[in-house]
Amino acid sequence: MSSALIKCLNLAKTVGNATVRSFLAAPKQPWQSCSAAALQTPHVQMPMQMHTSAVRRDLMEFFDDKKNWSENEVKVGRAWRTEELRIKSNKELHQLWFVLLKERNMLLTMEHECNDKMEVFPSPERIDKVKISMENLETVVRERNKAYHLLETGETGERPQKAVKNAFGLQVSYKACEHALPPFMNLKWIKSRNIGYGGRAVNRFLLKYREKLYNAKRKAKNRSRNEVMMILRRNPNFDLDVLRRQFPDVNVDKLRNEDKIRGHYVPKVGV
Amino acid sequence: MNNCIKVVPIALRCQQRTISTSSVLEGKRNFRKFNAYNKRGTRVVKEAQKTLANPPVAIHKRGVRDTGILVDGQYVEIPEKIPDIIVPDLTGCKLKPYVSYKAPDVVQSEFTSLDLFNAVYSQKIIEDFKAGKLQKDGSAKEPSVNEQLTPEEALQRARKTGSDIF
């Protein structure tokens, strides 16, 4: 049985090698993006093509330009915004992703090397800019993915989420993921999961936690009410509509009938 | 004076500073306190890591995934497990990692399924409507390749190997 399995796997390896060879022998065609939204655009299914960057036999692409090595500051622009990335095509987004990936690898390499050599790493905020650009790029790809799924299947195509309670009794959002085994066969998961939460300690924790949340809310409400009180006390002719719009939680009309908004002065009687 | 000369070595020896340490702990005795990854540890540990099906310390692969499986102690490579990284051709690429602060502002809303429908389907529907090639339920008499796409096929196409899962 195992020897037969080994033979099957070796045969699969041979077929795989033949496939790769046929891919390499295929005539060069422009590369097509594998993004879900781009699958709609070409009317014919293009065969899978492979590309690599230019071969460089050293690792100097992981390091910055030599003239920047001893600088205290490297001037660069800002991160890519979501609006700017939305006007790019899928191919351009793919290229930009790898440009940002190379930049990130270069920056991390330089940071590590500067730490080793006890030197100043110039402009460390570049790492944050590259990270923001990558996050925005993923946001745009996700938008297009969702648009494709909504148009063709009626669903968003993202992983379904479920609200579950963790061991402390707090509600967290669980994103489903794929498993090789069905749940009833997954012995490791069955043994490791704890069905439900409980115990006196959890109940006491939840009581204190909710009390903490309630106290925060109560203090915020009291703070707003006190602020309105002081405004009316110092400025008796304040515009009440502005107060109602700015402090929706406070009952301004009820507050006006109370003595709290009366100031330290004698009201002016008609002379 | 002779007495002083005789006493000098003793005095110097008394003034010498000494240190003391605890006994040296060999690795074999307190194995649990050491991080013994792939090539660390004693010879016996390395042999066990190499031969046992479930080694005492898990093999540290540094985040790299396997491209095959072990069958009866023999490593078999599986072609489907080898990652196929699709890298675009960056020659002539004008995009840079940063955007100049002088760049003009861009206003562009989110790409929605309606935009995708307008880009792909609406032109053909308009032409079919003008030519009278629509059926009573609104579908086309001569559907294009995109119109023949069923939801299952579209989902399969989107969920091919290498697609993003959000």
UniProtKB/Swiss-Prot annotation, chain B:
Q: Where in the cell is it found?
A: Mitochondrion
Q: Which domain of life is it from?
A: Eukaryota
Q: Which region ranges are annotated with the description Disordered?
A: 136-166
- Keyword annotations from UniProtKB, A to Z: Mitochondrion, Ribonucleoprotein, Ribosomal protein, Transit peptide
Is Ribonucleoprotein one of the keywords UniProt gives this record? yes
Cite the residue span of the transit peptide: 1-26
Gene Ontology CC annotation, any one = mitochondrial large ribosomal subunit
Query: What are the recorded Gene Ontology BP terms?
Result: mitochondrial translation; translation
Q: Does the keyword Ribosomal protein apply?
A: yes
**Sample GO molecular function, one term:** structural constituent of ribosome
Q: Which family does it belong to?
A: Belongs to the mitochondrion-specific ribosomal protein mL41 family.
Q: How does it assemble?
A: Component of the mitochondrial ribosome large subunit (39S) which comprises a 16S rRNA and about 50 distinct proteins.
What is the protein's given name?
A: Large ribosomal subunit protein mL41
Which species does this protein come from?
Drosophila melanogaster (Fruit fly)
